[in-house]
């Protein structure tokens, strides 16, 4: 009897873990699809819901940051980008978005620090380094005038 109970508990536990993992994956996939369809409010809701089940999902934080950027909510954008980078320090897209925020703030010492990190991790967004350098150069030129 004890063995049967043990087996049933194991099966129930396994199903709960599997269901939660599957559900959170579905939330993210659905959120990403909604984002791509420009249904940002629904995407935001599902991304946040996904984080309830999987609080260490850097992709959900990144998509929330993108949505908040579209909504011009810099505080939430930055908060979600920082969460993304905390969980996935080599996320190029999040790093570039943070650099962009710091450039807009004219925080050039921070940009140069982040740029050095970005250059170490870039694999697919390396062309953005030129853009960063141009923006820094434009600031230096306008400062000299």
What are these regions (language model features)?
Residues 25-49, 53:
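Alpha-helical segment of the N-proximal tetratricopeptide repeat
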Residues 36-37, 70-71, 104, 121, ...:
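Register position in tetratricopeptide repeats
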Residues 63, 97, 131-135:
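Canonical tetratricopeptide repeat
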Residues 49-50, 83-84, 117-118:
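Canonical positions in the second alpha-helix
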């Amino acid at each position: 009897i004890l063995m049967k109970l043990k087996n049933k508990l194991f099966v129930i536990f396994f199903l709960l873990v599997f269901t939660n993992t599957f559900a959170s994956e579905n939330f993210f996939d659905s959120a990403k699809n909604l984002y791509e369809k420009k249904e940002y409010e629904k995407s935001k809701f599902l991304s946040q819901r996904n984080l309830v089940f999987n609080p260490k999902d850097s992709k959900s934080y990144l998509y929330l940051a993108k949505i908040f950027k579209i909504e011009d909510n810099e505080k939430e954008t930055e908060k979600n980008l920082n969460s993304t980078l905390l969980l996935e320090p080599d996320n190029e897209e999040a790093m570039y978005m943070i650099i962009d925020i710091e450039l807009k703030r004219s925080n050039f010492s921070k940009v140069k620090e982040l740029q050095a990190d970005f250059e170490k991790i870039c694999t697919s967004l390396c062309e953005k380094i030129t853009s960063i350098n141009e923006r820094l150069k434009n600031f230096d030129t306008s400062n000299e005038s």
